[in-house]
Swiss-Prot record:
It is found in: Cell inner membrane. InterPro entries: ABC_BtuC-like (IPR037294), ABC_TroCD (IPR001626). GO terms for cellular component: ATP-binding cassette (ABC) transporter complex. This is Probable metal transport system membrane protein TC_0698. One of its GO terms (biological process) is response to zinc ion. Keywords: Cell inner membrane, Cell membrane, Membrane, Transmembrane, Transmembrane helix, Transport. It comes from Chlamydia muridarum (strain MoPn / Nigg). Its main location: membrane. Part of an ATP-driven transport system TC_0696/TC_0697/TC_0698 for a metal. The chain crosses the membrane at residues 18-38, 41-61, 68-88, 101-121, 142-162, 186-206, 242-262. Pfam families: ABC-3 (PF00950). It is a multi-pass membrane protein. It comes from the Bacteria. The keyword Metal-binding does not apply.
Amino acid sequence: MLMISILYSLFPPLLFPSLLAAFGASIAGGIVGSYIVVKRIVSISGSIAHSILGGVGIALWLQYQFDLPISPLHGAIASAIFVAICIGNVHLKYHEREDSIISMIWSIGMAVGMLCISKLPSFNSDLADFLFGNILWVTSRDLYFLGILDLLIVATVSICHTRFLALCFDEKYMALNRYSIKAWYFLLLILTAITTVVLMYVMGVILMLSMLVLPVSIACRFSYKMSSIIFTASILNICCSFLGIILAYILDLPVGPIIAILMGIAYSLSLLLKRSCNTSTPSPVSPESKINS
């Protein structure tokens, strides 16, 4: 309630739904993005993110062609989870061909989405919204659904944080404690899939990786502790998202590209700041960090 009161007092009421959606997406991106960067599965998350367009396109086409009560958000979540499971199987069973198969899934997902969207009467408008984001027009129904997804992400990570750390740093630890590495890996990919859907409304399909990766990369330059990285990345996401929404509203420009540019500027400034401190740049997170940190 305090956050809602602050948003109402600081920003125009018209922007409140967009800012609320951006706040939830920023938290999700900061949390899950930290595990993605540390586990070094950015390319896998990129494939999941871009394959979402296939589910969005199919949902829009079914909605237009057969008047079915299916929203693009439903299509996005279904395709994201499906692709995450497919890529997880590829990673675990066909590691030597992983890059080629992931690239194929990435390409097919986007191709299917673009073909379906091309059959819609408002091709250019819809394609731009889902490629580059259009959070300024988020509906209350979408906001509730995004809130549920965000709560699911936060609750899961709060319960499973130690297991995810073990998965990222020490799989032998998991094996010795008889935890299923495969099951936890799939859970992380599914969380990544859900997060990409949440970020789709802020950044669009093409630019959402900047919200997953860049804030975490900035945070990793100044901290070794996972909890600090998650907190810093989430704050950076919130700041860049809020500023991007306000600038987009004032300048009448797409939100996603502005946020991506702000993220890039923040990353460049972090490089300069780190260099000015004359300290060596740390690796994303030290393997010697405690598993329960």
